[in-house]
């Protein structure tokens, strides 16, 4: 596999069997938005590709569960920090399950690594990288000769991005430990960790050695990842990661989506209108490094492309597909899956891979038209679809249920009741009643399909 490193702007070959990946996760003070979804889905694809070709992947995605935004939420809601963070961690993980994001091997929470963070600050203090101001302990960026080497910024660009709320030695200096009487005891004074320190301590505790891949949104490159790299370089005496990967922004009407801009589109909002697999397909449809402009029409088109996958599944009477065990490779056998893996090995060229998937579905349908009773052909296509589902992370549902998505239990019962009435009417040659029931359901966007095994129904989405 070759991946474009955000730092060197060059494709770096990843040819190890054991791969370590750390993905910066959410700050858990609100429901997750599409920006969080895109980052998780893009790097879940990376993980799936590696697992599918037999790599052993050690994957961590953190939770920032102590932060100024969470404290603000506490003040507004009257809830405890634990009540807020537990609620939104659960909410986030529900969203990830619906999007078919594989559960990480490690899900570290910042509050569980306070001792490790203090140990890191002690190391930095011992080597002269820190100083104290009235509100906390700061990292002196002028002591790090390689500071800004990650984001490749110059000092003027750096200064323009930072505020000067306290009298720091350098505009680019950042807080390691914020004094706060409501939190943790330490030799520096009661307080809580700075955001940039949290990730370094968690990475060091879990992985111990230089990461193969550090991933996150492009908005984290500076200052977050720059400051992480500085602390690891100066405190842990090593490079933090060999490859840095950053996914592009999700935009709404051409503007970056963020909670601070009050233009967030929550995952849960999208899932009210579209199933998780359709949203996943949509978020994967552009290259991870490109900026992604949210469009309802594009999401609808992505759903139509996914429909073709399920039409083929339905034609083959292929039911639910089980996702693969992350502890074992899935033993890719089909030629199409091997071809798609080869494409994705080139910096996750997903557009080309999805185009090949479209071609495969079209070709498979043509072959089935010619040889509808060929059992070997059908079995080969079924195996290919199962492998492709595990690589892309969509296509797992039973096809019949897929085309019935979005219908409530009560509506489902009413539909089934009307189908029985229609079946009885047809037996009695009461075709006017049978046609009237069909029209009644059609007006509710339900279409009926009469098959040798009985009548089935689907929801009309367009």
Curated annotation (Swiss-Prot):
Molecular function as annotated in GO: ATP binding; cysteine-tRNA ligase activity; zinc ion binding
Cell compartment(s), UniProt: Cytoplasm
Lyase in keyword set: no
Motif 'KMSKS' region: positions: 256-260
Subunit structure: Monomer.
Annotated residues for binding of Zn(2+): 24, 199, 224, 228
Protein name as catalogued: Cysteine--tRNA ligase
Binding site for ATP: 259
Entry similarity comment: Belongs to the class-I aminoacyl-tRNA synthetase family.
E.C. number(s) listed in UniProt: 6.1.1.16
Co-factor: note: Binds 1 zinc ion per subunit.
Organism of provenance: Campylobacter jejuni subsp. jejuni serotype O:2 (strain ATCC 700819 / NCTC 11168)
Keyword Disulfide bond in annotation: no
Protein encoded by which gene: cysS
Location of the motif 'HIGH' region: 26-36
GO BP annotations listed: cysteinyl-tRNA aminoacylation
Keywords: Aminoacyl-tRNA synthetase, ATP-binding, Cytoplasm, Ligase, Metal-binding, Nucleotide-binding, Protein biosynthesis, Zinc
UniProt catalytic activity: tRNA(Cys) + L-cysteine + ATP = L-cysteinyl-tRNA(Cys) + AMP + diphosphate
Single GO cellular component term: cytosol
């Amino acid at each position: 596999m070759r991946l474009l490193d955000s730092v060197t702007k060059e494709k770096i070959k990843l040819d190890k069997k054991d791969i370590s990946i750390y993905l910066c996760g959410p700050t858990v003070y609100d429901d997750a938005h599409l920006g969080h979804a895109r980052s998780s889905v893009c790097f879940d694809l990376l993980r799936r590709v590696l697992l599918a070709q037999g790599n052993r992947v050690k994957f961590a995605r953190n939770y920032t569960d102590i932060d100024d935004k969470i404290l603000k939420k506490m003040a507004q809601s009257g809830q405890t920090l634990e009540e807020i963070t537990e609620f939104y961690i659960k909410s986030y993980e529900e969203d990830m399950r619906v999007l078919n994001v594989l559960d990480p091997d490690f899900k570290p929470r910042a509050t569980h690594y306070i001792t490790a963070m203090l140990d890191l600050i002690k190391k930095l203090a011992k080597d002269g990288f820190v100083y104290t101001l009235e509100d906390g302990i700061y990292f002196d960026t002028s002591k790090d000769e390689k500071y800004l080497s990650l984001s490749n910024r110059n000092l003027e660009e750096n200064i323009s991005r930072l505020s000067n709320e306290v009298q720091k030695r350098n505009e680019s200096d950042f807080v390691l430990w914020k004094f706060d009487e409501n939190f943790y005891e330490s030799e520096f004074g009661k307080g809580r960790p700075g955001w940039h320190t949290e990730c370094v301590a968690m990475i060091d505790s879990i992985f111990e050695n230089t990461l193969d891949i550090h991933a996150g949104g492009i908005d984290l490159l500076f200052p977050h990842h720059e400051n992480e790299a500085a602390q690891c370089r100066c405190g842990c005496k090593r490079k933090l990661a060999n490859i840095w990967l950053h996914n592009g922004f999700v935009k709404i009407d051409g503007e970056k989506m963020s909670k601070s801009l009050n233009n967030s589109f929550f995952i849960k909002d999208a899932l009210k209108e579209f199933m998780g697999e359709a949203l996943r397909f949509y978020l994967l449809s552009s290259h991870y490094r490109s900026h992604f402009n949210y469009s309802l029409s594009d999401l609808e088109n992505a759903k139509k492309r996914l429909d073709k996958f399920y039409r083929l599944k339905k034609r083959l009477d292929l039911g639910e597909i089980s996702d693969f065990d992350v502890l074992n490779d899935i033993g890719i056998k089909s030629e199409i899956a091997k071809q798609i893996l080869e494409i994705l090995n080139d910096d996750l060229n997903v557009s080309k891979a999805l185009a090949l998937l479209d071609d495969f579905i079209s070709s498979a349908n043509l072959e089935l038209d010619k040889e509808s009773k060929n059992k070997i052909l059908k079995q080969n296509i079924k195996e290919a679809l199962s492998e492709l589902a595990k690589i892309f992370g969509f296509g797992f549902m039973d096809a019949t249920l897929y085309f019935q998505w979005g219908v409530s239990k009560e509506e489902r019962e009413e539909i089934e009741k009307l189908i029985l009435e229609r079946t009885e009417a047809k037996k009695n040659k009461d075709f006017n009643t049978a046609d009237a029931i069909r029209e009644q359901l059609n007006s509710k966007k339900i279409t009926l399909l009469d098959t040798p095994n009985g009548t089935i129904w689907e929801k009309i989405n367009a």
